Amino acid sequence: MMATAQSLEDQTLLAFAQLMEGGQEDDETCRELDALTKLLNDDYNASQANPQHQSICRVIDGDCVDTVLGYLDMRQPDAVRAHATLATSAYLKAAGQDGSKKLSAFFFDRVRRGTYDDYIVAFCVASAIFPVVPELSATLFLSEGFLGSLGPLMRREWKSRKVETACLEMLNTACMNPLCRDAVQKYCVDWLEEVVDQHPQGSGAASDAEPKVQGEGGSISMRRHSEQVQHLAAVILAKLRAVPSKPPHDGQPRPRVEPAVTSIQDLSAIFTKMILRDQDHGTQHSVEGLAYASLQPSVKESIIADTRLLHKLVKTLTLAPPRSPTTYGALSIFLNLTRYRPRLTDEETKMNQLKAYANATDGLPYLDPLDDDEHVCVRCQAVFDAGLVPVLVTHSKNGSPASLSLIVSIIHALAVTKSLRAPLAQQGAVKLLLAAWAMIPSTDEPSRRMAAQALARILISTNPALVFGGNRPTPINAAIRPLGSIVAPHATAETRDLLPTFEALMALTNLASLDDEETRRSIIKLCWPDVEEQVMSSNQLVAKAAVELVCNLVQAPEGVALYADATPQASTRIHILLALADADDTGIRSAAGGALASLTGYEPVLRSIVQRDRGVDIILGLCSDPDQGLRHRGVVALYNMVAADGEAGNLARDKVKRQGGVDVLKDCLKQSHNPDVVQTAAEALKALLAEQTS
């Protein structure tokens, strides 16, 4: 065991020695970093499994840490930096507290030295580790005096723009942390404004002046900053504008209007100008900035109004590599453009009104009319017309879970518009949603439910036969499990939203309407308990949709068996159907009547109806209903009962006659104009009168 530990330590030191040598090809460097990453990950796993394990981190000193962190320098190739980030992450996980101490010492030592190279490496390291160890990174970032020193630093003349760029990259990454974002707002916003506000080439005086020596002070507005630096500063300002800081804790009210040199609209214009260029340089930062700026309704409207920009954003997403920052940023823009306000229940609406009255001194909460449903609907149409959906389909095949979640959210919003549902299906949205539902981790329940609901919306408004089957590789049964997953309301949601339930039931009803017993059989197998529960829903629309689905399901033998197997459960189900056939809502009565019309041809169902006190009365009530459709369902059910053979038929005919069925059928014949109703009622009456004369 000791020999193995010694061997691992030797391998670790050898890996660091080769990394320290330098001068290697990038591929060799990446391989060495990967080898180190594996050693560290294995070491961490061994420590977790055995507390007595001697970690290889004990041979990793400050020089070793400096070596790995040096490969995070922005002047290194992107591939090397990516592999170095993985190695750094593995080291910090394996080394624990000691690793955090060494990293902190490295950062503060480099900042204290204050040379050109030291600043670049320190800022690059801070940027790289923020997503890896956010708490440690925030501690470094918020250390006393650090942020305050950045203003004077940006006023110095350097031999290149890399110090400025590295500094702004660090600030940009740090804005993911609320405390760091507030600190940037407090200490850096003034000079960030100056950087953004100046002309890229600076003023005439600055252009003609001799370059200042390193360390000389002066106004930032008199420095000449590159476009890249300006755009980075603009992205940071966009994040500060889009995500408001927390109110002060000292009890002092925040000013209603905070002074700002550069508005969010100005920043949006900067990003738009950069994106519309034919150059790729700066696109990533501009897309990221516009993603934050487009949280504002006015910016959303300006993007939609600029057809050229909208198409360029679609093209940018088309060309962006999978899992890249540009892909995520572009998807975020389209999500912001298409996102509807959350649906509020009546209770939530009343609660918000009460809160508004309680806080009347601060003014009522403002809901921008540019973000109402009408404006969002127009934006969704514009985004669809720009050709976004095929690009989303392509990106969904190779995207990260985070990107896939954004794609699903966009399709979900587009599917709100009924006129877009069939085109969405034609452009591949159904296959996208089915794949997404299967790929999204079960831990991301909101995204999975959103994918299922978007699928339901599309399948409500399209002919399933045109979406599935034939030469299409996707079988219709692939949609049943996702739809079934949202029939039951979300168990852990704070509010009870029945819209997904309703839409799923409608979509399943559409699938069950096909002449395909296998589809009905699958729905019963996968969804029946939840469907049956919704039959008794207190929401009339949900109950109606559930009973309509039942009406289609009982066309299959498995559906009939649920009501006609002569068990107590089946009898209870018939009792519920009879009660629904007597409901106040016409739609519920119609769906229940349709199910009874199909089921009354089976003896156990017939007996169950006859044995109920009001069973026959309810069927006769359907025959007397003013609605011709309901009347037709009633006379079909009644005919099945009185035309039945054997003892069950005799019982049915006897009770129907005793309940005044002959007169009901005569009145039905007089008042009906539908030939099907007249013919069926006449046959039922004939069956009753034939027995009476025999």
Task: Walk through the language-model features, giving the residues of each.
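Short sequence/structural elements of tandem HEAT/ARM alpha-solenoid repeats
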Residues: N50, Q54-D63, Q97-A105, T139-G145, ...
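Long amphipathic alpha-helical scaffold regions
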Residues: Q11-T262, T272
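Short inter-helical turns and helix N-cap capping residues of alpha-solenoid HEAT/ARM repeat scaffolds
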Residues: E25, Q76-P77, G114-T115, E157-S160, ...
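Acidic, serine/threonine- and proline-enriched intrinsically disordered linkers and terminal tails
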Residues: L331-V391
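Buried hydrophobic core positions in alpha-solenoid tandem helical repeats
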Residues: A15-L19, T67-L72, L103-V111, S149-M154, ...
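Alpha-solenoid helical repeat scaffolds
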Residues: A3-Q11, A35-K38, Q54-P77, H83-D118, ...
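Acidic, Ser/Thr- and Gly/Pro-rich intrinsically disordered linkers and low-complexity segments
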Residues: A15, D197-S226, Q265, L317-T326, ...
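Alpha-helical solenoid repeat architecture
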Residues: C30-N50, G70, A79-A95, I120-E135, ...
